[in-house]
From Swiss-Prot:
It is located near the subunit interface in the base of the L7/L12 stalk, and near the tRNA binding site of the peptidyltransferase center. This protein binds to the 23S rRNA, and is important in its secondary structure. InterPro entries: Ribosomal_uL6-like (IPR000702), Ribosomal_uL6-like_a/b-dom_sf (IPR036789), Ribosomal_uL6_a/b-dom (IPR020040), Ribosomal_uL6_bac-type (IPR019906). It comes from Deinococcus radiodurans (strain ATCC 13939 / DSM 20539 / JCM 16871 / CCUG 27074 / LMG 4051 / NBRC 15346 / NCIMB 9279 / VKM B-1422 / R1). This is Large ribosomal subunit protein uL6. Keywords: Ribonucleoprotein, Ribosomal protein, RNA-binding, rRNA-binding. Part of the 50S ribosomal subunit. It comes from the Bacteria. NCBIfam families: L6_bact (TIGR03654).
Amino acid sequence: MSRIGKQPIAVPSGVTVNAQDGVFKVKGPKGELTVPYNTELTVRQDGDQLLVERPSDAQKHRALHGLTRTLVANAVKGVSDGYTINLELRGVGFRAKLTGKALEMNIGYSHPVIIEPPAGVTFAVPEPTRIDVSGIDKQLVGQVAANVRKVRKPDAYHGKGVRFVGEQIALKAGKAGATGGKGKK
């Protein structure tokens, strides 16, 4: 039995679930999500819990069991609590602001970088050097946050750029002879 797949999924109050024809629909206070799943697996509700069951111990079913359970659990958590990923800007003059719903960043290029959020994702800028990416779809929020980070990845020598809050950047040592002073005669 899959260690992940056999765990029940708690359904909070205010969240309704419906699984039929290979599509799992979950509706909650923050919105509505649909998750497709393999019809060989069954998703059933038992009181305030959801259970994902597989028909056999075949390799394919074992692989899909844990995956489906995690996708369904992410959808339930997304519509009840939502997901937020925090990013920070490091560098002299690096700052961000909201222009309407779009994120505008000055991150060392000769022009500001503007990123439009896809449907279901919102940006927030609590400080000029911090960006919050939030939404109900965990995969989409993570992908958008990765796309924002990709615009200016942290530099290997100084750590300047866009990074996740708490991310440790392994900095490289500079050139050994870069201490200054007079050159060779």
